[in-house]
């Protein structure tokens, strides 16, 4: 299973680790993914998704249905 957010599509970022002597080596910055069961009010059921903590924070603010609508996601297929 790839480390990708089910709702936002966030994935790993390629970055550099810089030492004290400024030697740069490649580093993979993974997304902070969490496995969560979210209640979908319109569908009257739980949805099991793998989401980033940033997405969870946005869902708490806006709501699951409005976030999915803004991202163009059909929750009945998740």
Curated annotation (Swiss-Prot):
Alphabetically ordered keywords of this record: Ribonucleoprotein, Ribosomal protein
Gene3D superfamilies named among the record's database cross-references: Ribosomal protein L28/L24
Cited InterPro entries: Ribosomal_bL28 (IPR026569), Ribosomal_bL28/bL31-like_sf (IPR034704), Ribosomal_bL28_bact-type (IPR001383), Ribosomal_bL28_sf (IPR037147)
Superkingdom assignment: Bacteria
MF terms in GO: structural constituent of ribosome
SUPFAM superfamilies cross-referenced by the UniProt entry: L28p-like
GO biological process: translation
Any single GO CC term annotated in Swiss-Prot or TrEMBL for this entry: ribosome
One Pfam family from the record: Ribosomal_L28
Keyword Ribonucleoprotein: yes
Presence of keyword Signal: no
Family per record: Belongs to the bacterial ribosomal protein bL28 family.
HAMAP family, sorted: Ribosomal_bL28
Annotated protein name in UniProt: Large ribosomal subunit protein bL28
Species for this entry: Prochlorococcus marinus (strain MIT 9211)
């Amino acid at each position: 299973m790839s480390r990708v957010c089910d709702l936002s599509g966030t994935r790993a970022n390629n970055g550099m680790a810089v030492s004290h002597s400024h030697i740069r080596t490649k580093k993979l910055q993974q997304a902070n993914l969490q496995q969560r069961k979210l209640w979908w009010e319109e569908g009257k059921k739980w949805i099991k998704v793998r989401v980033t903590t940033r997405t969870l924070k946005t869902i708490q603010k806006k709501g699951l249905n409005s976030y999915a609508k803004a991202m163009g996601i059909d929750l009945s297929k998740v």
